[in-house]
Amino acid sequence: MFRRSRKSEISGRIASKSYCRLVRMIDEYVAYHAASPIYSADLAEQCGVSVRTLGTAVASVRGMSLHRYLRLKQLWSARAQLVKGSDAITVTSCARANGFHHMGEFARLYRAAFHEPASRTLARARGTD
């Protein structure tokens, strides 16, 4: 009944490629600025687009909001450090190194994402669980 025009298919693919490129730029920015708070406006300026465009790109490519995506990137980075089980790392230092400055918020988000406290992840990695 309704057919997509060839033009809309091509523009959709171009948009998808540019959205994927933006998400890669976000990933690089987050990795480089892991210890700092990440603000959408700064990220958008760095990528040369609006905050809305960043949000649309993340929603299109990752299926979630920009804010949620950024938080999950930080949480996964923290988990990767905790899983290594280094004696030099604490949960607090790991949280701060990944942009979390409110330990209660970090604890709540970590438990919600990984179904265990960060301290248990670290203890298991060290073999003391």
Annotate the PLM regions:
Residues A107:
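DNA-recognition helix of C2H2 zinc fingers
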Residues L22-V23, L70-L75:
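Generic hydrophobic, amphipathic alpha-helix propensity
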Residues M1-A35, Y39-V51, T56-S65, R79-G104, ...:
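Alpha-helical bundle regulatory/interaction domains
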